[in-house]
């Protein structure tokens, strides 16, 4: 978790209350700041694909909007700390691909409109939440994140399912690769693993150098750089109203802030 104010000062890491951040800790931290002028970026998918098949989990739930999906996932997940690994495991081969025993992987490769648009326009290779295997998979974090959003609701609006509020906090979906590309980091080299590389990326965001850290991890540098990127782009109207995002897409699948 990294946070910054307006201006140029580099984002700072926020110390967790108990050694490492849990989802529950993040949930409580956000509830305490719901009335603050805060733009919050989460790096996970806020919804599963809906429009291609008119269902999130065909044959299982009749949910037609992300909030109904979040509630369904939460109701059918018993994992600690808002986890969702069991939700995926009990549905492997039916909705999720976790390995060769689940069948032909291509049959699970359904994408949201936002991911299709991002991939088709050279942004990279955004993953689908139905693919739950490999280092690039986003399924486990995304369905766990949906549980977090369910418990956060209705304290903080979630864009673009909700319009941006006139005051108070707002949550958006982010993709750290977008921030890395904006900082001039080439494809395949998105991770920053030392202070010098982080400062070069921050400079591209109009930010001052960061305070040195005892150790550099992908999670820490991603959080710092993406917080700076959000600050730089928070007032860009084209990112709040991307031409490819229709009202139907926003209502059923959401969108990633930064995909234009």
Each predicted region: which residue ranges?
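RNase H-like (RuvC/DEDD) metal-dependent nuclease/polynucleotide-processing core
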Residues: 1-39, 44-260
């Amino acid at each position: 978790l990294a946070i910054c104010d307006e201006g140029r000062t580099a984002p700072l890491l926020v110390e967790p209350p108990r050694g490492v951040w849990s989802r529950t800790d993040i949930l409580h931290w956000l509830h305490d700041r719901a009335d603050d002028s805060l733009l919050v970026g989460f790096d996970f998918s806020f919804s599963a694909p809906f429009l291609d098949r008119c269902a999130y989990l065909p044959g299982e739930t009749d949910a037609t909007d992300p909030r109904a999906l979040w509630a369904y996932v939460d109701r059918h997940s018993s994992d600690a700390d808002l986890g969702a690994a069991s939700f995926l495991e009990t549905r492997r081969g039916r909705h999720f691909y976790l390995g060769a025993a689940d069948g032909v992987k291509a049959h699970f490769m359904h994408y949201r409109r936002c991911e299709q648009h991002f991939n088709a326009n050279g942004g990279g290779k955004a993953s689908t939440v139905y693919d739950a295997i490999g280092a690039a998979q986003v399924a486990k974090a995304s369905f766990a994140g949906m549980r977090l959003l369910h418990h956060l609701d209705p304290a903080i609006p979630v864009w673009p399912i909700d319009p941006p509020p006139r005051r108070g906090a707002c949550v958006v979906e982010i993709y750290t690769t977008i921030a890395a590309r904006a900082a001039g980091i080439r494809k395949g080299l998105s991770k920053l693993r030392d202070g010098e590389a982080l400062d070069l990326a921050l400079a591209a965001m109009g930010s001052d150098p960061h305070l040195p850290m005892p150790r550099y991890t992908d999670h820490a540098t991603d959080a710092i750089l993406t917080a700076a990127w959000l600050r730089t782009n928070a007032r860009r109207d084209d990112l709040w109203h991307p031409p490819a995002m229709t009202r139907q897409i926003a209502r059923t699948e959401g969108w990633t802030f930064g995909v234009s």
